[in-house]
């Protein structure tokens, strides 16, 4: 957690409403940090369904493996998250730590260990002493309440500079349902079917299979379209929980993601995911500029995504943006190396709506002063038009600054 808040942090922080069936509490367990909270317990009422998507890393953490296995049951009663230690690449002791954490949480709230979901973030390769949770989780279970969403988001931070929360309220049938979310990010972010640590909660009565389908579809153009440094974490976890409490107010029970009654809910659900994903991009380690990459005119959407990611992950492109340089030559380089169909002589590039390159060469109307003024702004849009088809996609990233190097050079110090 940095004491210096990113200049890209949202200016408006939403008031997070209560969600029936969800209680939260945080504490300082002394996992790594001093003088701050580092463990979160979320308790959910019986009947809560769960869905999740996780890292594709072949070196997944022990909590990720635990959650993947328990997700088969489709039900959840608790979520335990710790910051400061990722419990990744920790061998047999890592699995034992995950098991002990789940057992302690289950004892604290009175459920089965298989109904406890886990997430850890922090340093990789250091054993997690789960005995530090003994007693702490019991106290959290007693202290848990329906408020405290911002405190929860703060407890899961590592190098983040601000807590990330989002909320939406929508009608399901004739009843009002709420969707709350929190996330943490900052570095080692290039998600694939998941991201960092993100948790979504709703009181909508959704089956586990329905929730899973919504989550899997929702991450495609939100969390999976964000990259900070091109590195996919061992711990990426996105979990969604539905308590179903809104059924008491007349919300219909939904078992299929294709149910037309879900239309407004899906829109709101995806909006929460998109909001959190953008906050992650805004809080990239050392970031001073939010960068939106749009690729259009590609052969396919898949091709457009790959080209957009090639641009977004290029250190040369990102450092040019940090230097407020509209260096379209580096964008051309990134397009060319993406391995996707592209025609140099059809390529056009613009920065914040000002075209700098057209038909494979510098735009005849290029004005250095005009473009330089745009590059000083905190939000930069790079649009690439390939002129080959109708494929289009969008990716969010940030610039690459000296501070990113400093943060990661000192991370274990």
Curated annotation (Swiss-Prot):
GO terms for molecular function: glutamate N-acetyltransferase activity; L-glutamate N-acetyltransferase activity. The active site is at 195 (nucleophile). It comes from Rhodopseudomonas palustris (strain ATCC BAA-98 / CGA009). One of its GO terms (biological process) is L-arginine biosynthetic process. This is Arginine biosynthesis bifunctional protein ArgJ. It is an enzyme of class 2 (transferase). Pfam families: ArgJ (PF01960). The keyword Amino-acid biosynthesis applies.
